[in-house]
Amino acid sequence: NEELEEYNAKLDEDQQYDSNDMVGKLGLEQSYEDQLRGVDGSQKMYVDNMGKVLEIIEKTDSVAGNDIYLTLDSDLQKYCYNALEKELSYILLANLKNVTTSKEKEDIPITDVYSAFFDNNIIDIKALNAANATDNEKNVYNTFVSSKQYTLNALSDILKSSHTELYNLSDQYKDYMEFICETLSSNGIYDSSAVDKDSDTYNNYVNDKISLYEYLKYCISQGVIDITGIQTSSDYYDTDEIYNVIVDYVLKEFEDDSDFDKRVFKYMILSGEITGSQVIYLLYDQGILNSTTDEDYEEFTSGVLSNFEFIYRKIKKLEITPAMLALDPCSGSIVVVDPATGTVRAMVSYPSYDNNKLTNVIDPDYYAKITEDKTTPMYNRATMQRTAPGSTYKMLIAAAGLQEGVIDVGSVITDYGTFSKVVPSPACWLRSGHGTLGLADA
């Protein structure tokens, strides 16, 4: 196959892999494959017509590959991972607000947390309709089915009858219009890169002045819509007929589209069709939290803890983690280097995954789970992501300031959270600032 050919492309014939070889595909196993790989053994033998071995006439023993030794400190590695997760949770809690929506970019409304459980597949939507579903799950599912059908009917009316301009649509249905374009694009029907970005129609659309109906008909006339991938009854259509084919296709796609379903849940939560209490009970219904061992369960069910207080406490305890929510921030990395030797003592990417489930025999359910995870745990941020240095940069600035005499060990500054002397103005994650700090504390 193609993968085997790729592995063997630069190898001599006697060193090439065959389909039975085990190959490192991720992490260290992949990076050091040429070191870890051993040499296959072989046997030549005589067998009878039943396959029974009669005599081994030649044998070559296999040879193990080389060992590799890491400089990583296992305990430090675990400590850094846990510390990073805890720090991310503190930032989430600092920005978490008991509101439905917020205009402040850094705020995280509690409704975003409820939606995140669906959006990042923590709550299994399909399980809501299982034979053993709880009453709460069934109630949520029935509400969802009704709301989804209402939404599909409304979209059909907007696209086929009213042709409502975007400025006359609610934010919810503007979002659905954008999602329709995304779906058409990802399915190879709409080529957004081929649209004339200087055209009046395009600019009117992005500025909410016209309807999606008018914009798609323009795209059809410009040849940036391709319906050859859609099964149709004819090879020849005019513009109106192509538009109707697209609309029918989209509405049919949305009947069984998990991303569309997640959007429906998002707006059900925002409108109050599904309450925060129902979402929290779903966490217990589906085994994400355990009502038997959970010390907060009784306080929640008795009303001592509000929905917001319950979620806040669970995030603080890391029973609900940043990785589960996939809200900003939900990821990070730590690299610890020994300054005396330059050896790497810890290299952590959060969130991570269990690569033992992806070696030799791949666990398909687990692989599907992590590839669909919004936090992209298979992306190693410690080695692959370029990010601002953050607080690490403070040591460099402090050393430079001391060396140049701009500050001394007794200098203090007042941190207001945002550095407004330049535009754009960089801001700390804690927008209110850290107050007055000395050199050691900063």
Could you describe each region identified by the protein language model?
Residues 21, 61, 69, 376, ...:
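Preference for short coil/turn "hinge" residues that link or interrupt alpha-helices
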Residues 66-72, 326-332, 365-393, 410-413, ...:
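Short active-site loop at a secondary-structure junction
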Residues 108-109, 369-371, 426-429:
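Short alpha-helix boundary/capping motifs
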Residues 337-372, 376-381, 386, 403-405, ...:
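Glycine- and small hydrophobic-enriched segments that form the cores of compact globular domains
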Residues 358-361, 387-439:
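Short, glycine/proline-biased beta-turn/loop segments that scaffold the active-site neighborhood
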